[in-house]
Amino acid sequence: MYKLTVFLMFIAFVIIAEAQLTFTSSWGGKRAMTNSISCRNDEAIAAIYKAIQNEAERFIMCQKN
């Protein structure tokens, strides 16, 4: 009887632990956007675009010579 009680308690513990791991919302899966922080920096994008444009113009000038 004692072994059966311990076994049933162990099984209950395993089921509860599995449920807690399976339904933990803090990790795994896709997370909903909680903060609407923009990761886009328009000034940096404009600076990169301008640098690429300048290098392209310089490359074209070198090809003409």
UniProtKB/Swiss-Prot annotation:
Residues 1-19 form the signal peptide. Keywords: Amidation, Cleavage on pair of basic residues, Flight, Hormone, Neuropeptide, Pyrrolidone carboxylic acid, Secreted, Signal. InterPro entries: Adipokinetic_hormone_CS, AKH/RPCH_hormone. The modification Pyrrolidone carboxylic acid is found at residue 20. It comes from the Eukaryota. The keyword Cell inner membrane does not apply. GO terms for molecular function: hormone activity. Coiled coil: none annotated. It is found in: Secreted. GO terms for cellular component: extracellular region. The modification Glycine amide is found at residue 28. GO terms for biological process: flight behavior; neuropeptide signaling pathway. Its main location: secreted. Belongs to the AKH/HRTH/RPCH family. This hormone, released from cells in the corpora cardiaca, causes release of diglycerides from the fat body and stimulation of muscles to use these diglycerides as an energy source during energy-demanding processes. This is Adipokinetic prohormone.
